[in-house]
Swiss-Prot record:
InterPro entries: ATP_synth_su8_fun (IPR009230). It is found in: Mitochondrion membrane. It is a single-pass membrane protein. One of its GO terms (molecular function) is proton-transporting ATP synthase activity, rotational mechanism. This is ATP synthase protein 8. The keyword Transmembrane helix applies. The gene is ATP8. It comes from Debaryomyces hansenii (strain ATCC 36239 / CBS 767 / BCRC 21394 / JCM 1990 / NBRC 0083 / IGC 2968). Mitochondrial membrane ATP synthase (F(1)F(0) ATP synthase or Complex V) produces ATP from ADP in the presence of a proton gradient across the membrane which is generated by electron transport complexes of the respiratory chain. F-type ATPases consist of two structural domains, F(1) - containing the extramembraneous catalytic core and F(0) - containing the membrane proton channel, linked together by a central stalk and a peripheral stalk. During catalysis, ATP synthesis in the catalytic domain of F(1) is coupled via a rotary mechanism of the central stalk subunits to proton translocation. One of its GO terms (cellular component) is proton-transporting ATP synthase complex. F-type ATPases have 2 components, CF(1) - the catalytic core - and CF(0) - the membrane proton channel. Keywords: ATP synthesis, CF(0), Hydrogen ion transport, Ion transport, Membrane, Mitochondrion, Transmembrane, Transmembrane helix, Transport. The chain crosses the membrane at residues 12-32.
């Protein structure tokens, strides 16, 4: 199991942090604004 070998700790931590930061960036810039735009459009349509 490479997770328990100390040689792989830095590699796993580096790419883990890289993957998490890329995922967080994509979610905050692409996915959440689209969902927010959809929710605002739905609430304004129902209030009309």
């Amino acid at each position: 199991m490479p997770q328990l070998v100390p040689f792989y700790f830095t590699n796993l931590l580096t790419f883990g942090m890289l993957a998490i930061s890329m995922l967080l960036y994509l979610v905050s810039t692409i996915i959440l604004p689209n969902i927010l735009r959809l929710l605002v459009a739905r609430t304004t349509m129902t209030k009309l």
